[in-house]
């Protein structure tokens, strides 16, 4: 059987502040082989202290993964397994890491920020 590819579509909630700048995520799209490690980056709106990650499977609504207040990860109850990790070491940019990707990880990953 050939190697299966997973398609990762990364979009952001486009919140805006007085400058019109919004949440930025990269990469915008990611295709990974099963078993590959993936890192997704979220740049929140400047000045926002709260940051949220969500996962949206095909045909489903967004589901909560984790929540940060500055650099502190206050709730990670939604992270689905020990292969998912999130960090925000400087209280600004956050990274969601998925190790050893599996077919069921294929989803839209959303990041949002707030004051």
From Swiss-Prot:
GO biological process: adaptive immune response; cell surface receptor signaling pathway
Principal location class: membrane
Gene3D superfamilies found in the cross-reference section: Immunoglobulins
Statement: the UniProt record of this protein carries the keyword Glycoprotein: no
Disulfide cysteine pairs (residue numbers): 42-111
First and last residue of the signal peptide: 1-21
Locations listed in the record: Cell membrane
Ig-like domain ranges (all copies): 22-115
Keyword annotations from UniProtKB, A to Z: Adaptive immunity, Cell membrane, Disulfide bond, Immunity, Immunoglobulin domain, Membrane, Receptor, Signal, T cell receptor
One GO CC term on file: plasma membrane
Protein function: V region of the variable domain of T cell receptor (TR) beta chain that participates in the antigen recognition. Alpha-beta T cell receptors are antigen specific receptors which are essential to the immune response and are present on the cell surface of T lymphocytes. Recognize peptide-major histocompatibility (MH) (pMH) complexes that are displayed by antigen presenting cells (APC), a prerequisite for efficient T cell adaptive immunity against pathogens.
Subunit structure: Alpha-beta TR is a heterodimer composed of an alpha and beta chain; disulfide-linked. The alpha-beta TR is associated with the transmembrane signaling CD3 coreceptor proteins to form the TR-CD3 (TcR or TCR). The assembly of alpha-beta TR heterodimers with CD3 occurs in the endoplasmic reticulum where a single alpha-beta TR heterodimer associates with one CD3D-CD3E heterodimer, one CD3G-CD3E heterodimer and one CD247 homodimer forming a stable octameric structure. CD3D-CD3E and CD3G-CD3E heterodimers preferentially associate with TR alpha and TR beta chains, respectively.
Protein name, entry field: T cell receptor beta variable 7-8
Record lineage: Eukaryota, Metazoa, Chordata, Craniata, Vertebrata
Gene name tied to this protein: TRBV7-8
């Amino acid at each position: 059987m050939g190697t299966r590819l997973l398609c990762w579509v990364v979009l952001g909630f486009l919140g805006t502040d007085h400058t019109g700048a919004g949440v930025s995520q990269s990469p915008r799209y990611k295709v990974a082989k099963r078993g590959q490690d993936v890192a997704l980056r979220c740049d929140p709106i400047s000045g926002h202290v709260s940051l949220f990650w969500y996962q949206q499977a095909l045909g489903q609504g967004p589901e909560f993964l984790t929540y940060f207040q500055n650099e502190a990860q206050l709730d990670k109850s939604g992270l689905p397994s020990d292969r998912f990790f999130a960090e925000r070491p400087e209280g600004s940019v956050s990274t969601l890491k998925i190790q050893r990707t599996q077919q069921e990880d294929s989803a839209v990953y959303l990041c949002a920020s707030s004051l």
